[in-house]
Amino acid sequence: MNKIIEVNNVSYHYDKEHALENIHFQVEKGSFTGLIGPNGSGKSTMLKLILGVLKKQQGSIALFGEKQADFKDWVKIGFVSQKSNAFNSAFPATVKEVVASGLTKKKGLFKTLNNQDKEAIDYALKRVEMTDYLHRNIGELSGGQQQRVFIARALVSRPELLILDEPTVGVDVENVKAFYELLAELNRTEEMTLLLVTHDLVAVNTYVNHVISINKRIIFDGSAHEYQHYLADRELEILAEQRRREDACLDCDASPV
């Protein structure tokens, strides 16, 4: 099974406004994919469709080779929202309790933690270097520390796919690089498939190996190396267009009155 996500000709609209038009792409097993685009480009809508929050209106989506409508093994997918720390900054739960909540997909609600669960929590916190904060309240931590805890919550069930929606929102600049290094290590050492929604082109150029750019439709889909060439070509096109406009203006100025 090499294709973790398959999106084929998916369209979605809100009332009469098209949010997505004929979107098609694949996320391969073991890839670190960046999904990018300007505000209002449909990135969040695409994530909601993949995660089943919204129902597609046209096209098909498959997860791990299964039609999304038939997919039941959601424990394979971890999700980190951009608003995790905003929702929990004043919440009195401990780090252990927050991470343990990531086991509900596997165990159900209000289940007592067994030794295997405790080992899973320990594993997840070690991966994000937060074991010393086990009994600290989540509200006491910085934005970067909180987001590491929420990655641990996503990792505790050992997902094969980790989806992150603008995960560095609210993270101080000093911790952003360390955060992306952590994601790259998970991709490299755990062979975990990552789908990262971001505006951070530095992160895209530095860490991901597959880029999908959308603006209500597919703009680019290829390797990170190909994307750098694409950007360079686009910059040359923009400069050429500016030169044509400048030349046209000069011609207008030179015309006799």
UniProtKB/Swiss-Prot annotation:
Question: What protein am I looking at?
Answer: Zinc uptake system ATP-binding protein ZurA
Family to which this protein belongs: Belongs to the ABC transporter superfamily.
Q: Which gene encodes it?
A: zurA
What InterPro entries does the record tag this protein with?
AAA+_ATPase (IPR003593), ABC_transporter-like_ATP-bd (IPR003439), ABC_transporter-like_CS (IPR017871), Metal_Ion_Import_ABC (IPR050153), P-loop_NTPase (IPR027417)
Keywords from the named record: ATP-binding, Nucleotide-binding, Transport, Zinc
Q: What molecular function terms (GO) are annotated for this protein?
A: ATP binding; ATP hydrolysis activity
Q: Where is the ABC transporter domain?
A: 5-241
Species name for this entry? Listeria innocua serovar 6a (strain ATCC BAA-680 / CLIP 11262)
Q: Which Gene3D superfamilies does the annotation name?
A: P-loop containing nucleotide triphosphate hydrolases
